């Protein structure tokens, strides 16, 4: 937040939230500057404030020989009174003539540094602190302050980099206030002023003031996809805008924390669509979870609603545009309070930021618990979604959900420190640039998720130790297996197998029952060297059975509730699924409360390992197509091959496993969900893997088979580009594979980013068809995405185009050789049912496969990668 003020030669105070301050704002400020009586009128207009006593309240009037009292009643100490804070080889004190029209006496003096100077403050209590820096470049005979260029740094953060007031301001003679919110973890806080070579640094006043810990919680919501975001306390913030929507200017003495709130009119895109509403501040009642320190009653007592929302077409949004820096992430705090409804549960609306849905179907009655009850929401907007302006919009829901209206009471826009802990520019305190940063938003989210997992694990350990004595009886592995499928699968008992185990085995069709000793022997007593995978359930080991068969042994961790839940789900799913392109369950073990599942061993491991990261021989384009086709068959079977469709919910390249012949099989059904007959979605908490998650699933928390389609689209791009879905080490625009690849696709230059190993080997038409399939999978809305059957059809066609291309090149090569007749040679007919007619290797005539019918039960040859798939795989399984 910047505050500009003019003394005698600079006559007005301007709060610089944009380049065009409104007339209402200027009038309110002039009232404030006119004297105590006017201030009292302004205070009465906005109402009383709830006080907060900061542990640290350091106010310095730099360059002053005596203390100064500001119009809001605060006292700033002089240089002599604060000499213990400053470390400087030399400094120059300058002043301007006194004037009754100066906004505040702190702008009449300044301190100038020609070399680096440091203020060191000993804090009473570490934690969140406001840091406010005041600047005004008034004329003096020592130095032209308008040309001063300098940086301001803390031990960890860059607050200002090569700051020059004439560049920062449309009016270089106006005062500027920079406001920051920093979480100080040490008892000492250092503030360094570093002038540029042959220049100087200056400062008029400094504030270091404690802020309440609850002002910034550690968690919020990330935008697009909408997902929980943790770690907000790890950032520093610059207050850029603080807006009282639909209300007047609120001066510091009328705010609960001495903040300034400006009116919203200069940011409102179309005033004709907005209507101001208000109530008395005393009508605002804070719920227990919202402290009055978040925002005063006067913010929540005013709002903007949709103009004429009851009489005109309500299908419009009210928009506010805020100039911003697209190089930074932003924390947007939105304030809501339902002061327009006459009854509960009558107002539902959507909130959008930069065109993306930030909050869908906001029901203030539910989240706030009452009418006139404050509620706020923190939204983190990644720099990849930023432009020169930040846009906030409110609008009604597009369905019959009560009154067609939407409201907003307040907006705060805070710039977040970047990957090198800078709030201004790309250089960190240690000279690193953002290009060298080791973490960004995605990496931070990943770290926080891992940290949360450790916290959850600790809670589970505590719960495990406190378990009742009869826990084992009530929670044996077999006890929670539900008799889902009374199949007729044959089974074998192991040596010493119990009747109880055989009963569950035959009921569930789980295959062979293994004793614990058998699996210990098979895995060398679960030796660490045998681990081939790790998940929330526990470890996966490679094992060798008595007959030499290699298996994958998944051993559950009883201390992980997530693992138990996923085990239950996986057993329920696998007990009724049999398909060539789904990993098969061989058997299980529940001895001594163990939770162990035994699967067929996939010797070539995850698909991802063959694309990047493992230095394995690169796959050909045909091999990649066949693997994608096999995976698509498996997913299509899940969606349509059972009475109840199944949504995998965690489709990714590590969950597509390859056997010794590179046949693809979909694995890991721990997050899968059944879809009841007649339903097209499942309302459920958002789960999955970052980078693959369906954005619509995030927004609506409604899981559909199109969520799998979206994730599979990301897998297709991995196959084409041979890089991870998310890579935080890359430049910002390349972090997300789906977004990056689609940008190149729209430019018609996708071939520029494909795996270099594929260069010159792909038929352009095959790649075009493949890329079109991926693009359709990645549509924002599920209704616009194809079914897995449609995806499979397109992949089959891409494969046929590639095979025709390859055959055409082979024929050209053969025709270029001299004719040689080999005695006894006999022409061999092509066993493939497709005989492409190749005119040239540029354009091969390929029969288009018949469209896949979603519920076709006719079997075709699943073993041939060259067969023309006019019908679908046997959905009855085998």
Swiss-Prot record:
Gene3D superfamilies on file: Galactose-binding lectin, Phosphorylase Kinase, domain 1, Transferase(Phosphotransferase) domain 1
Region (Disordered): 808-844
CDD domains the record matches: STKc_IRAK
One GO-annotated biological process of the protein: regulation of pollen tube growth
Molecular function, one GO term: protein serine/threonine kinase activity
Keywords: ATP-binding, Glycoprotein, Kinase, Membrane, Nucleotide-binding, Serine/threonine-protein kinase, Signal, Transferase, Transmembrane, Transmembrane helix
Domain of life: Eukaryota
Extracellular side of membrane: 44-440
SMART domains: S_TKc
InterPro entries linked to this entry: Kinase-like_dom_sf, Malectin-like_Carb-bd_dom, Prot_kinase_dom, Protein_kinase_ATP_BS, Ser-Thr/Tyr_kinase_cat_dom, Ser/Thr_kinase_AS
Class of the enzyme per the UniProt entry, highest EC level: transferase
EC number: 2.7.11.-
Positions of transmembrane segments: 441-461
Active site: 650
Membrane-side (Cytoplasmic) residue stretches: 462-878
Domain Protein kinase, residue spans: 526-798
Glycosylation sites: 170, 183, 254, 317, 382
GO cellular component, one term: chloroplast
Binding site for ATP: 532-540, 554
Topology of the protein relative to the lipid bilayer: Single-pass membrane protein
One Pfam family per UniProt: Malectin_like
PANTHER family in the cross-refs: OS07G0107800 PROTEIN-RELATED (PTHR45631)
Similarity comment text for this entry: Belongs to the protein kinase superfamily. Ser/Thr protein kinase family.
Name of the featured protein: Probable receptor-like protein kinase At4g39110
Species this chain originates from: Arabidopsis thaliana (Mouse-ear cress)
């Amino acid at each position: 937040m910047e505050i500009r003020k003019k003394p005698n030669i600079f006559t007005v105070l301007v709060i610089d939230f944009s380049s065009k301050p409104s007339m209402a704002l200027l009038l309110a400020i002039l009232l404030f500057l006119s004297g105590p009586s006017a201030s009292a009128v302004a205070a009465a207009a906005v109402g009383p404030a709830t006080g907060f006593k900061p542990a640290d309240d350091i106010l310095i009037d730099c360059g002053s020989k005596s203390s100064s009292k500001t119009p809001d009643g605060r006292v700033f100490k002089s240089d002599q009174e604060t000499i213990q804070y400053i470390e400087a080889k030399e400094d120059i004190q300058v002043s301007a003539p006194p004037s009754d029209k100066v906004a505040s006496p702190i702008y009449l003096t300044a301190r100038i540094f020609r070399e680096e100077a440091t203020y060191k403050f000993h804090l009473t209590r570490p934690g969140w602190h406001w840091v406010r820096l005041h600047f005004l470049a008034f004329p003096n005979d020592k130095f032209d302050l308008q040309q001063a260029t300098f940086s301001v740094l803390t031990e960890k953060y860059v607050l200002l980099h090569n700051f020059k007031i004439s560049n920062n301001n449309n009016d270089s003679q106006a005062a500027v206030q920079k406001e920051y919110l920093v979480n100080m973890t040490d008892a000492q806080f250092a503030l360094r002023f570093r002038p540029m070579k042959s220049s100087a640094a200056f400062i008029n006043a400094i504030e270091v003031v404690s802020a309440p810990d609850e002002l910034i919680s550690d968690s919020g919501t990330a935008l697009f996809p909408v997902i929980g975001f943790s770690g907000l306390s790890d950032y520093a913030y610059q207050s850029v805008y603080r807006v009282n929507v639909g209300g007047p200017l609120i001066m510091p003495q009328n705010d609960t924390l001495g903040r300034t709130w400006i009116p919203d009119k200069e940011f409102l895109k179309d005033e004709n669509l907005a209507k101001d509403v208000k109530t008395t501040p005393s009508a605002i009642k804070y719920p227990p979870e919202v402290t009055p320190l978040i925002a005063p009653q006067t913010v929540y007592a005013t709002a903007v609603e949709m103009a004429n929302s009851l009489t005109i077409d309500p299908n419009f949004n009210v928009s506010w545009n805020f100039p911003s820096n697209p190089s930074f992430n932003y924390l947007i705090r939105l304030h809501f309070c339902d002061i327009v409804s006459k009854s509960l549960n009558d107002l539902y609306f959507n909130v959008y930021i930069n065109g993306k849905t930030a909050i869908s179907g906001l029901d203030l009655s539910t989240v706030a618990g009452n009418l006139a009850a404050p509620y706020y929401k923190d939204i983190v907007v990644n720099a990849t979604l930023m432009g020169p302006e930040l846009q906030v919009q409110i609008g009604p829901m597009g369905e019959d959900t009560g009154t067609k209206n939407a409201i907003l009471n307040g907006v705060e826009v805070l710039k977040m420190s970047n990957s090198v802990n800078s709030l201004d520019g790309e250089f960190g305190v240690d000279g690193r640039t953002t290009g060298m940063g080791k973490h960004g938003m995605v990496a931070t989210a990943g770290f926080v998720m891992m940290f949360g997992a450790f916290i959850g694990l600790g809670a589970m350990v505590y719960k495990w130790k406190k378990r009742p004595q009869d826990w084992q009886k009530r929670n044996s592995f077999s006890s929670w297996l539900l008799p889902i499928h009374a199949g007729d699968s044959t089974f074998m008992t192991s040596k010493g197998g119990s009747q109880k185990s055989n009963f569950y085995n035959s009921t569930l069709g789980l295959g062979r029952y293994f004793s614990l000793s058998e699996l210990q022997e098979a895995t060398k007593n679960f030796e660490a060297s045998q681990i081939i995978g790790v998940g929330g359930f526990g470890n996966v080991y490679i094992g060798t059975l008595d007959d030499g068969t290699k298996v994958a042994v998944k051993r559950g961790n009883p201390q992980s509730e997530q693992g138990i839940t996923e085990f239950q789900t996986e057993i329920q799913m696998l007990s009724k699924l049999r398909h060539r392109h789904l990993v098969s369950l061989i058997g299980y073990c529940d001895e001594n409360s163990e939770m162990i599942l035994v699967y067929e061993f996939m010797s070539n491991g995850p698909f991802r390992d063959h694309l990047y990261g493992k230095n394995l021989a690169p796959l050909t384009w045909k091999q990649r197509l066949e693997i994608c086709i096999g995976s698509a068959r498996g997913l299509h079977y899940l969606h349509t091959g059972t009475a109840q469709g199944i949504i995998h919910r965690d489709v990714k390249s590590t969950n597509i496993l390859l056997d010794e012949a590179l046949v693809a099989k979909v694995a890991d059904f721990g997050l899968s969900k059944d879809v009841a007959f007649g339903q097209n979605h499942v309302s459920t908490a958002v789960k999955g893997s970052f980078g693959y998650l369906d954005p619509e699933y995030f927004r609506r928390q409604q899981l559909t088979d199109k969520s799998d389609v979206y994730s599979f689209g990301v897998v297709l791009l991995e196959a084409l580009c041979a890089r991870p879905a998310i890579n935080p080490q890359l430049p910002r625009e390349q972090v997300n594979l789906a977004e990056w690849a689609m940008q190149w696709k729209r430019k018609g230059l996708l071939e520029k980013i494909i795996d270099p190993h594929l260069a010159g080997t792909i038929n352009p038409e095959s790649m075009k068809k493949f890329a079109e399939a991926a693009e359709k999978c990645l549509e924002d809305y599920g209704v616009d995405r194809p079914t897995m059957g449609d995806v499979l059809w397109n992949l089959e066609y891409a494969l046929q185009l590639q095979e025709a291309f390859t055959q055409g090149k082979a024929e050209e090569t053969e025709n270029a050789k001299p004719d040689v007749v080999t005695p006894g040679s006999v022409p061999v007919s092509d066993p493939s049912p497709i005989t492409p007619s190749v005119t040239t290797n540029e354009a091969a005539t390929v029969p288009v496969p018949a469209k896949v019918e979603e519920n076709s039960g006719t079997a075709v040859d699943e073993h041939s990668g060259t067969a023309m798939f006019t019908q679908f795989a046997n959905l009855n399984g085998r």
